[in-house]
């Protein structure tokens, strides 16, 4: 049993830890709890995944022979069952269960400065969360809150639209499971609303403290906490070498309007950097992404600029792309004498990459 979750008569390898058992039974076994179709054994779960992937390979002609396909399936099953490697959660959630499974855990989206594009961003994120994955996006194309609209008035600005996206993320459980949606929201350091972005979470944290002191339930699912905004995303400011150098020299920095040059503003670069650090000290957000360095290390520069990352930031790539993660457990390749089994590791890598 884990909290309110309980499933009887489950089957796990003796070598698996209690923690691994809890996680798999609660999050990765598919089928309605207490129904005959509910998975109850690791053998069922691993066979569902490895068998489906092997069948895809057979259908698409990946294997030279029937025997090769069978060998691949057996090796992948062995690797997964002995915890030598593991796929990202959407694979366990969806493969062999959904007709068209969402397998990638990490998505990077894009958005343009139109209402249609902004609404499309929210729709895409909702579908990504439903499939058990997370997404990142850079909102710097959206005009600032002081910029004009064609038909009069001023724009809402990206920080305002973040409220709606944050609410959707808080509502949609990732993959229909207990895992919450994961978001990364990025804004460039030269965006006119960058200070609102820097402080949006810190201001909400002040509200959280006031509600706590007033006696509200501020646990993660409590009524008080769920009323606090911007809590379902990691926020990061995208900084360039030029900005950091200007801050170091104590120079001014230009905030650039997206569509209206009249809205440009000069600010003290060092003060802006200090405010970013102050907000991060208060609430651990925003983080910093070093735009210049990231793009200098870009492995596919011809495909476009890197503007954002996935929520955990290990995946940095072009907009409208996705990544299917897997992890290998290096300790499983350590021999009794402390040496590393390079041949077994290389073979496991080949099998897992083919499966991916």
Describe these PLM feature segments.
Residues 1-356:
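Extended catalytic cores of very large enzyme megasubunits
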């Amino acid at each position: 049993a884990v909290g309110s979750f309980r499933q009887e008569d489950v089957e796990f390898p003796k070598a698996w830890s209690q923690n691994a058992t809890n996680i798999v039974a609660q999050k990765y076994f598919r089928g309605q709890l207490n129904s005959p179709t509910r998975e109850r054994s690791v053998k069922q779960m691993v066979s569902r995944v490895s068998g489906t992937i092997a069948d895809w390979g057979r259908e698409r002609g990946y294997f030279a022979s029937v025997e090769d396909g069978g060998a691949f399936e057996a090796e992948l099953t062995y690797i997964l069952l002995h915890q030598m490697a593991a796929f990202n959660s959407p694979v366990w959630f969806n493969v062999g269960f959904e007709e068209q499974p969402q397998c990638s855990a990490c998505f990077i989206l894009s958005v343009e400065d139109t209402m249609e594009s902004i609404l499309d961003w929210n729709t895409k994120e909702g579908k990504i969360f439903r499939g058990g994955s997370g997404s990142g996006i850079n909102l710097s194309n959206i005009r600032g809150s002081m910029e004009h609209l064609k038909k009069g008035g001023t724009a809402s600005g990206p920080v305002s639209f973040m409220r709606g996206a944050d609410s959707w993320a808080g509502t949609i459980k990732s993959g229909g499971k207990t895992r919450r949606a994961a978001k990364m929201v990025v804004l460039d350091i030269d965006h006119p609303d960058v200070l609102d972005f820097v402080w949006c979470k810190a201001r909400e944290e002040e509200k959280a403290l006031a509600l706590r002191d007033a006696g509200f339930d501020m646990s993660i699912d409590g009524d008080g906490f769920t009323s606090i905004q911007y809590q379902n995303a990691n926020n990061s400011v995208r900084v360039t070498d030029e900005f950091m150098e200007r801050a170091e020299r104590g120079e001014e920095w230009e905030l650039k309007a997206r569509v209206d040059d009249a809205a440009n503003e000069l600010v003290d670069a060092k003060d802006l950097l200090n405010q970013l650090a102050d907000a991060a000290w208060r609430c651990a957000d925003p983080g910093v992404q070093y735009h210049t360095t990231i793009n200098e290390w870009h492995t596919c520069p011809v495909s476009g600029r890197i503007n954002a990352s996935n929520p955990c930031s290990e995946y940095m790539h072009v907009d409208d792309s996705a990544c299917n993660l897997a992890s290998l457990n290096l300790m499983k390749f350590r021999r009794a004498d402390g040496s590393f089994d390079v041949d077994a590791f290389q073979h496991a890598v080949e099998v897992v990459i083919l499966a991916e």
